[in-house]
């Protein structure tokens, strides 16, 4: 199967960032699938493993992501109807075959078992990814965003996320930073900040101007800086994020032309958060 990457990317991309996240997730998944096809043809792509076991590694990543997601959802004792409905809706939207749906559902169900071997599964993920930081980080962020599927992270879910981060080689501080940034992004989306403006940007309308102190605080979290950060620190964080998300640079790395507008939306989100802070601090 050469579509596991797209399926996984679209599913968790939607959880992480709505339509933008789904499209970007599909793109990431496409890169995984492309590397898999090249390796099976006898080439050495150097991404997401290599050699004859490429297909097995791809499938391991897919199943592990769903099973760990099920484990996170079960951590608070009961998987909510909203979480189940969201998973079902996304599978329908992706037009999965019956076999593919069963594979994802079985993996999710396995993760809910009380004897689910989380540490062993995470070790297999590390092997499947070749220990590459970017792929392990992607896996962790999938779990963080899935924990926010029902709008909040339960303390028990947070504990499981810490186990996941530790098993993948991330520190508690690195996890907490991702949790704060994801929570801030979620609040922006719900409260009419940049996340909620994705639909507006498609219709050509202007960004809404959040006015509350809470939304300003979220803007700091989006940039990954504290409210006490100096102007220089804010600028440095902003430039770093813009460098990582600049549409032209993403295109140069293989982003399809059709996704240029999507990349622009992401950079606009970063710019919007920066503008709020710049005006507040009087940064020139």
From Swiss-Prot:
Domain notes for this protein: The transmembrane domain is a dimerization domain.
Subcellular location: Cell inner membrane
Biased composition (Low complexity): 197-211
Lineage: Bacteria, Pseudomonadati, Pseudomonadota, Gammaproteobacteria, Vibrionales
Keyword Iron-sulfur: no
Protein species of origin: Vibrio cholerae serotype O1 (strain ATCC 39315 / El Tor Inaba N16961)
Lipid bilayer topology: Single-pass type III membrane protein
Periplasmic side: 1-6
Keywords tagged on the record: Cell inner membrane, Cell membrane, Chaperone, Membrane, Transmembrane, Transmembrane helix
Pfam families linked: DnaJ, TerB
Protein name: Co-chaperone protein DjlA
A GO MF label: protein-folding chaperone binding
């Amino acid at each position: 199967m050469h579509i596991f990457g797209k399926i996984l990317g679209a599913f968790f991309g939607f959880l992480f960032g709505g339509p933008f996240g789904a499209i970007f997730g599909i793109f990431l998944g496409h890169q995984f699938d492309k590397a898999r096809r090249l390796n099976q043809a006898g080439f050495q792509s150097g991404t997401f493993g290599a050699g004859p076991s490429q297909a097995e590694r791809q499938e391991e990543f897919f199943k592990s992501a769903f099973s760990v997601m099920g484990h996170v959802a079960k951590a608070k004792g009961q998987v909510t109807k909203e979480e189940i409905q969201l998973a079902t809706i996304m599978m329908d939207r992706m037009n999965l075959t019956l076999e593919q749906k069963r594979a994802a559902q079985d993996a999710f169900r396995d993760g809910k078992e009380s004897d689910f071997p989380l540490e062993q599964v995470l070790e297999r993920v590390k092997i499947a990814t070749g220990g590459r930081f970017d792929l392990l980080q992607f896996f962790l962020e999938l779990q963080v965003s899935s924990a926010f599927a029902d709008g909040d992270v339960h303390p028990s879910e947070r504990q499981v996320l810490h186990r996941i981060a530790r098993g993948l080689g991330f520190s508690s501080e690195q996890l907490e930073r991702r949790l704060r940034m994801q929570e801030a992004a979620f609040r922006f989306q719900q409260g009419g900040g940049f996340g909620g403006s994705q639909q507006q940007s498609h219709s050509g309308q202007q960004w809404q101007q959040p006015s509350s102190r809470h939304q300003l605080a979220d803007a700091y979290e989006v940039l990954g800086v504290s409210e006490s950060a100096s102007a220089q620190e804010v600028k440095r964080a902003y430039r770093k994020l813009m460098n990582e998300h600049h549409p032209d640079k993403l295109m140069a790395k293989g982003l399809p032309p059709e996704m240029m507008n999507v990349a622009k939306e992401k950079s606009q989100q970063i710019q919007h958060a920066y503008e709020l802070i710049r005006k507040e601090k009087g940064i020139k």
